[in-house]
Amino acid sequence: MNNILILGANGQIARQAIDMFLKETDAQLTLYLRRSSRLENVDSSRAQVIEGDVMDMEKLKEAMIGKDVVYANLAGDLEQYAKNIVEAMSATGVKRLIFISSMGIYDEVPGEKYGSILDPYRKSAQIIEASDLEYTILRPAWFTNSDEIDYVTTQKGEPFKGSVVSRKSVADLIVKLAESPELEVRRSLGINKPE
């Protein structure tokens, strides 16, 4: 049984991943978010809710103690969040990180140049890649709300094979990576629906 810390637990992908973890695995979840009142109907026998901010290093470290996997699905100051996550994981001995980023951070989307808008994603990925963590960075295509699990992955340096992906597909990959922590270690994966 894995103990998983979910940072940004109220995000749309995170909520789908939480449902999948609870239905398909025996994982124990710690749901970390700024406003806990946003989460409803959480199975308290398998999920602990912590109200906190990734900028609060002491609370973040406390939440990481005893965890096997950290899954981060955040928006905001991604560069500082990545620094804090790496520091807190190093301090608590947690090695496995699944971090959601964005397609385009390596100019891997044919015909598209996203420029400086993706700088926070690029910088956070660089911080994680420079760490000694057992990370997997996910770079999803544009999100859809389709109720489907249909995706392919690409490695860093390979062009994307599509432009969209369902949130449910991303959640499925997150659960697979968390349940099989030896998969795709120290990799940055693009994820999209095949076209």
Residues covered by each model-derived region:
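Conserved beta-strand segments of alpha/beta enzyme cores
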Residues: 28, 48, 134-136, 187
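Short, well-ordered alpha-helices that flank and scaffold nucleotide-derived cofactor binding pockets
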Residues: 19-23, 27, 87, 130, ...
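Residues at the starts of beta-strands that form the adenosine-phosphate
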Residues: 2-3, 27-29, 95-96, 134
